Design a protein with these regions (language model features):
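N-terminal small-domain helix-loop-helix segment of the aminotransferase-like
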Residues: 2-89
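Aromatic/hydrophobic pocket-lining residues that form π-stacking "cages" and hydrophobic walls in ligand
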Residues: 11, 115, 174
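Helix C-cap/helix->beta junction micro-motif
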Residues: 18, 122, 177-181
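Short acidic capping loops at alpha-helix termini that bridge into adjacent secondary structure
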Residues: 75-80, 102-104, 149, 209-210
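Conserved PLP-anchoring active-site segment centered on the Schiff-base-forming lysine
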Residues: 77, 95-119
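Active-site phosphate-binding strand-loop segment of PLP-dependent enzymes
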Residues: 133-195
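Conserved core segment of the aminotransferase class I/II
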Residues: 212-243
Length: 243
C-alpha cells in the first residue's frame, strides 16, 4: 500500500520556502524560552542518585501531583500525571467509553483532528456538533445531539483551532446535559495560560462527578518535547486511570 502524504505537509513546505514571515499555526510550538528555574533544576537533577532515574509511581511523581493539586485546588488522589496532555485525553476518553454507556463522542466543530483520531482508535462513534459563528459553545446544538448513545462530550477551551474561550455557564449547561444522558464531559484546558484577559475559569469550578479536566506544561512552559501532562478525574474514575 502506497503512503499518501497529507496535503497540509505541502502547505508547510510552501510556508518554509516563502520569502516572508509566515505564522505557523500547525503544531502549537511556543516561541518563547522555558523558565530559567526549569533549566537550573534540570542541571541539578543530573547529579541526583541513581534511584531518582527509575520508575516513579504509575500515577506520577508525588511532589508533582501535590503541586498540581494545590494549583488546581483539588484532592491529590484525583491527579494522574501523564505522558503529555495527549495521554491525559486518551485516558479520559477511554474511561468514558469503557462504562457500557454508549459509544458516541460529541466533538465541537471545527475540531482539532486529534480528538477524531482517538475516538476512532477507541472504537467510538464521533459526532460533530456545530459551534456558534464566533466559536462559542452552542448549548442547544449539544442538547439536540446528545442521546442515550452518547458516552462522552469533549470540550477544548481555550479552543484549538478557533481560540474561543468557553463561558463557564455554557460549560455547566453542557455538564447538565451530559448528566441527563449518563455521559461524561472531558475538558482539555492545555491552553489555559493563553487567555490573556486573565479571567479564565476552569471546569473544575463545576461541582460534578461528570467532569474530567486535562492539561499540561508543554504550551505554558515551552517544553513540548518533555511530554508532561495530567488529568484530574472524578473520584469514581481515578482507579481505572492509575492502572
Amino acid at each position: 500500500m502506497e503512503y499518501e502524504e497529507p496535503k497540509f505537509f505541502h502547505v508547510m513546505q510552501y510556508g518554509a520556502a516563502a520569502d516572508r514571515d509566515v505564522i505557523d499555526m500547525v503544531s502549537g510550538n511556543p516561541d518563547w524560552e522555558p523558565p530559567g528555574a526549569l533549566r537550573e533544576a534540570l542541571a541539578a537533577y543530573a547529579d541526583f542518585p541513581t534511584a531518582e532515574f527509575q520508575y516513579p509511581p504509575s500515577e506520577g511523581i508525588p511532589a508533582l501531583r501535590e503541586a498540581i493539586a494545590a494549583r488546581r485546588n483539588v484532592d491529590e488522589d484525583r491527579v494522574v500525571v501523564t505522558n503529555g496532555t495527549g495521554e491525559a485525553n486518551y485516558l479520559g476518553m477511554a474511561r468514558a467509553l469503557d462504562r457500557d454507556a454508549g459509544d458516541e463522542v460529541l466533538l465541537m466543530d471545527p475540531v482539532y483532528p486529534y480528538y477524531l483520531g482517538k475516538t476512532t482508535l477507541l472504537d467510538g462513534t464521533p459526532t460533530l456538533v456545530p459551534t456558534e459563528r464566533d466559536g462559542d459553545l452552542d448549548v442547544e446544538a449539544v442538547r439536540e445531539a446528545a442521546s442515550t448513545e452518547t458516552a462522552l462530550i469533549v470540550l477544548n477551551t481555550p479552543n484549538n483551532p478557533t481560540g474561543a474561550v468557553y463561558d463557564l455557564e455554557a460549560v455547566r449547561a453542557v455538564v447538565e446535559i451530559a448528566a441527563s444522558v449518563d455521559a461524561l464531559v472531558l475538558v482539555d484546558e492545555v491552553y489555559d495560560h493563553f487567555d490573556f484577559s486573565g479571567t479564565f475559569e476552569s471546569a473544575l469550578a463545576i461541582d460534578s462527578d461528570r467532569v474530567i479536566v486535562t492539561s499540561g506544561f508543554s504550551k505554558s512552559m515551552a517544553i513540548t518535547g518533555f511530554r508532561v501532562g495530567y488529568t484530574v478525574l472524578p473520584e469514581p474514575h481515578v482507579r481505572a486511570a492509575k492502572t
